[in-house]
UniProtKB/Swiss-Prot annotation:
The lineage of its organism: Eukaryota, Metazoa, Chordata, Craniata, Vertebrata. This is Activator of basal transcription 1. Residues 262-275 have a biased composition (Polar residues). Residues 46-145 form the RRM domain. The gene is ABT1. It comes from Bos taurus. Residues 1-10, 25-34 have a biased composition (Acidic residues).
């Protein structure tokens, strides 16, 4: 494929700035080396970055405008964020007032243009930077300025990798936001369910005066009452009462006849053992 527009006059593209003299020196050095070696010069594509894209500016426009300076290859424009897009649509709908369908055009934030020759890309970026985009008086982009920058040693594969990385980061961020929203929803549902259980317990007849009741350990009397309620529990309760009465009668007889009580006899026998 023949490369168009390689031989460009510097007067047509405009004067070069002093900050890019180093790049020109490198190019001249490469050209002199190629001429000395007698080898054919290899055409290397170059990429120019567009930092500002006016509204309703499309890849076809940039291709038509920049094709006059050299052969343009691939062009990619980054669309605006979905949140900004929805905001603009809502603003357009409110401005229309519901009388007619609101007209909204998809806008872009930044773009990349590939030239077949990197030397042409460098010259275009230097000469057209901060110049009007439209040369005609009726052009809708007459009052917009070019914001061009040549990306040194940047290839189209680097751009593809960068865009794929941004898409992956966006997906991961979306998954994290969805997981966070799900956790918050589950916590809210559990809290609502717990509150419903508490409200349902307000009508419980086992809690007088609407006070909260908490389960405690049963007392000795309650335990005896439960045992007595079991089959055969009455007989065991009678035996326990008889044993208690016998113990009380034994202490009474000991007091009457002057004999020591069983507790005192145990207390007297303990020091004898210690001695």
């Amino acid at each position: 494929m023949e490369v168009e527009g390689l031989e460009l006059d510097t007067a047509e593209l405009g004067p070069l700035e002093g900050s890019h003299q180093k790049l020109e020196a490198e190019e001249e050095q490469e050209e002199s080396e190629d001429a000395a070696g007698g080898s054919k010069k290899r055409v290397v594509p170059g990429i120019v970055y567009l930092g500002h894209i006016p509204p309703r500016f499309r890849p076809l426009h940039v291709r038509n405008l920049l094709s006059a300076y050299g052969e343009v290859g691939r062009v990619f424009f980054q669309a605006e964020d979905g949140f900004v897009k929805r905001k603009k649509k809502a603003a357009a709908a409110s401005a229309a007032g519901g009388k007619k369908r609101s007209k909204y055009s998809k806008d872009y934030t930044e773009g990349w243009v590939e030239f077949r020759d990197k030397r042409v890309a460098k010259r275009v970026a230097v000469s057209l930077h901060n110049t009007p985009m439209g040369s005609r008086r009726r052009s809708p982009f007459r009052y917009d300025l070019w914001n061009l920058k040549y990306l040194h040693r940047f290839t189209w594969s680097h751009l593809s990798e960068h865009l794929a990385f941004e898409r992956q980061v966006r997906r991961q961020r979306l998954r994290a936001e969805v997981a966070q929203a799900k956790r918050e929803t589950d916590f809210y549902l559990r809290s609502v369910e717990r509150g419903q259980r508490f409200l349902a317990a307000d009508g419980d007849s086992t809690r007088p005066n609407g006070s909260w009741a908490f389960a405690q350990r049963p007392t000795e009397q309650e335990m005896r009452a439960r045992k007595a309620a079991r089959p055969g529990g009455r007989e065991r309760a009678r035996l326990a009462n008889a044993q208690d009465q016998a113990r009380s009668n034994r202490g009474l007889l000991a007091k009457i006849f002057g004999a020591p009580t069983p507790s005192e006899s145990r207390g007297n026998s303990s020091p004898a053992r210690n001695s």
